[in-house]
Amino acid sequence: MKKGFRGTGTVERVDFPNKGIAVTDDGDRVIVKNTIPGQKVEFVVNKVKHQRAEGRLMEVIEKSPLETEEPCPHFGMCGGCTYQTVPYEKQLDMKLTQVKKLISDAIGTEKESGYEFIGIHGSPKKSEYRNKMEFSFGDEYKDGPLALGMHKRGSFYDLVTVSDCQIVDEDFRTILKATLDYFSKNNIPYFHRATHKGYLRHLLVRKATKTGEIIVDLVTTTQTEGFNEEELLAGFRYALLTRHYDGRFKGVLHTQNDSVADVVKNEGTDVLYGDSYFYEELLGLKFKITPFSFFQTNSLGAEVLYETAREFILGDDKDSLNGKTVYDLYSGTGTIAQLMAPVCKEVVGVEIVEEAVCAAKENAALNGLDNCKF
């Protein structure tokens, strides 16, 4: 099979990370990403290495028997989600199979290596679960009207305005619409990747699931020809804060980024309203989060994960701290370390970034934890 070959195949399985294995009528196997087991797909081979072919998905000819769910209206065109047509329980089965294969490929099967595979825990929420989104400014087609959303599947340039995105709640959708309406009305140009001209780049939205606190960060270039930036940003702040939300605004920020790369990069941030941080709660502890700091994007799912880790530490003796010392390596701002602190004698967080260590100490003090060291 050569580069440029166009063919069809049925997806046999999907390996991590998101690599569908499509089998042709001749028995050849091709890696095709963004596919689902059981789909019949058309592909074009774009890479052949060590006799392994990889292809780009061109079309889903036949749906998989697994696809029984109604997706969000942007599914298929939006590059954000892959498995929305598959029932959640089946998605978990797919992930379980992928993880078991990774482990067995590395150290052998349960019987061979003596480990116990305890299964998979699902998220308490199956929709509107994300607490963070990074939307991009652009257009849905060349020279089209301003768009704000996610990249189209398979495209580096074109966007989809995801006004009905189902993995975030209504507050996210309200913020997206208010932002797009405001800048469209004022004819503000987005940053073109090809020409490196324009102002609008990204919109970062974070909302705490437990506290309901919201922070929005508008990321732009410093190219302000043709308008008064101070007046424009004041109007943006007003456009956001005068809408109705279930949560409450903690801060509105403006970050400058003149780098060529299409990533959110902080080259200076100003506070337009409120604070530059917000608080989220996990398992009864409180955490201070800034726009660019790492935090699990599914708060309720994170609680399931960390509660499971706590159970491992406690072992069979649920009523004893066991005098155990837990080491949190590459601890960052110490979220995991603090969540483990209530079930052990001492936690030691190890981190090379000095700013993260300072933040970890601050959060530990906020939660009154005296058995955490960073």
Show the residue positions of the predicted features.
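Terminal RNA-binding accessory module
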Residues: M1-E70, H74, K111, R153, ...
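Short edge beta-strands and adjacent turn/loop segments
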Residues: K197-T211
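Extended interfacial segments that mediate partner engagement and assembly in macromolecular machines
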Residues: E59-E70, G79-Y190, K210
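Rossmann-like S-adenosyl-L-methionine
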Residues: M1-G7, R13-P17, Q223-F374
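Short, aliphatic-rich beta-strand segments
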Residues: V205, G212-T221, K286-T290
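Short, conserved phosphate/pyrophosphate- and ester-handling motifs at nucleotide-, phospho-/glycolipid
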Residues: G38, V168, N298
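Short, acidic/hydrophobic/Gly-rich beta-strand patch recurrent on exposed beta strands
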Residues: G20-D25, G149-K152, D217-V219, A360
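Internal alpha/beta scaffold segment
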Residues: Y157-R201, T222-H254, V260
